Amino acid sequence: MNNKKTVWETKQFFLLPIIANYELFFIFAPLNLLLKEINKLTMGASQDEMSFLDHLEALRWHLIRSTIAVLIVGVVAFICKDFIFQIIFAPKNGDFFTYRMFCKIGHFFGFESDFCTEQLPFTIQSRTMAGQFSAHIWTSIWAGVIIAFPYVLYEVWKFISPALYENERKLARGFILIASLLFFIGVLFGYYLITPLSVNFLGSYSVSPEVKNQIDIDSYISVVRSSVISCGIVFELPIIIYFLTKLGVVTPDFMRKYRRHALIVVLIIAAIITPPDVASQIIVSIPIMLLYEISIFISAYVLKKEQNKVI
């Protein structure tokens, strides 16, 4: 019975962020209709010829619609408090999926692992009267930013699309899908890898047995939030390199030349955010270097297409 319960808990924790996005997607199905109606009211004029002020007005409404989407998702996240904070506080528990995985990896290679623990040596506290309420509000807003990210990208595309050729518009539609996918993969990477590694290392670090770790709730949530969002942005590297290559800022030769430097930077970052064992550092470094190599391939592809256009 205990084994069955453990398997279920593992699946539950592993799927929590995915389930959250899935459920909120269906909750906000009417959101698209609402924003379309706002779009009809505010963007009915032809965009064939627009002055600078017209562009500013259009940008203002794109920002307003994006903000509305983020706030609506944030309100639902605020209502689903228990579910959201179950996700956030899961990495502080010793039976979190990632800790069990690293513990098994350590046993496989025959060395002791800091992840083989039932409970991390710290507690979370709120030291101000409005601390928990403030944390609830800001967590809901950031949940709105993460979940509504594809729609925000869509609004960005709608703003720049009038200036694009038809073939570039088709490419931009693919950009929204790929960029959203990369972002959510990065979010999951940050949640299941970077966050538990950071929480385990920082929460367990001690300069003296005399000092007990009593972490403020804002500090803990900040670590989770920064890990998740920063990884989501880092995973946009191929998209960023694509546009930088189109603009002539970056070339594949430049990226190949500084590949070793990039590897050193990645290893240093991995050494900072992971416990001092080689296995953890390698597991963190490999996906980031893989993204770098993919970005080199994309840069070469874009440069070749641009050169063919000139010819």
Where in this protein do the model-derived segments appear?
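Short, often N-terminal, low-complexity regions
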Residues: 6-17, 24-29, 33
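Membrane topogenic/interface segments and analogous intrinsically disordered interaction regions
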Residues: 27-311
